[in-house]
Amino acid sequence: MAIITKVSAQKRQGRYNIFLDQEYAFSVSEKTLAEFVLLKGQELSPQKINEILDYEASAKASDLAARYLSYQPRTIKEVTDYLSQHEISRSAAKRAVNELTHLGYLDDAAYARLFVKNNLQVGKNGPGAVRRDLKKKGVDDDLIEAALADVTDEEWAGVGKRLVKSLLGQQGKIAKREVDRKMQTKLLSHGFSGSLAQAVTQDLVPEADEDQERAALVKQVLKAYKRFKRYEPGVREQKMRQYLYSHGFSGDEISAFLVGEIIPLEELEEY
């Protein structure tokens, strides 16, 4: 049996050093000190020392986890990973997580609902990306689907419009179909389905404006001409056709330009 010969407070508030048989043995929190009533002269068996150290590890894990949660909500996996990074044993981490779950501080279902709500309010991700992000955070599939279930297509469309509204500034600069393509590509990359992406695009840019389309064609024609005018006529025409096609203009529109219907070809140098 070892005897506690000294209990001294550390400079760090709430921490205490325990000396057994005149030698430093371990340190504990105030919570552990009170739980085991650790006082000078107390005898401790090896089993009791292990019990104290085990309790202290759990208390440390709980304190670390609570501090981590104080900044923002977390998932069970995030807290478990955080404790592991701080060299908390698996058993102590599990006890801390169970305690915080029992107290209601850890709740993956509530976290998933809040995550979805925040995305609807200020985020720019579609359901696919939200689902993927929650899976990375360790949330169970059933909880993810439950959180997504009440979100309507109209609500997702609102998120999608927020994501791609900056592309509206390209109207009149590139062809409408190219604006549509860019919007849908961006929406798909952020987890929106094809049908949602199409609905958002159609709602934002319902139909082509003839004046805007003509202005966009003229703008790109001038860019293309300046870029390729050094080539021989045949090569220049081919390169300009490819350039304009890549910017969303139809074959008929491109042909109309190449025969001088949009801008007389002899006037291109004047622009």
Swiss-Prot record:
GO terms for cellular component: cytoplasm. GO terms for biological process: regulation of DNA repair. This is Regulatory protein RecX. Coiled coil: none annotated. Belongs to the RecX family. The keyword tRNA processing does not apply. It comes from the Bacteria. The gene is recX. It is found in: Cytoplasm. NCBIfam families: PRK14135.1. Pfam families: RecX_HTH1 (PF21982), RecX_HTH2 (PF02631), RecX_HTH3 (PF21981). Modulates RecA activity. Keywords: Cytoplasm.
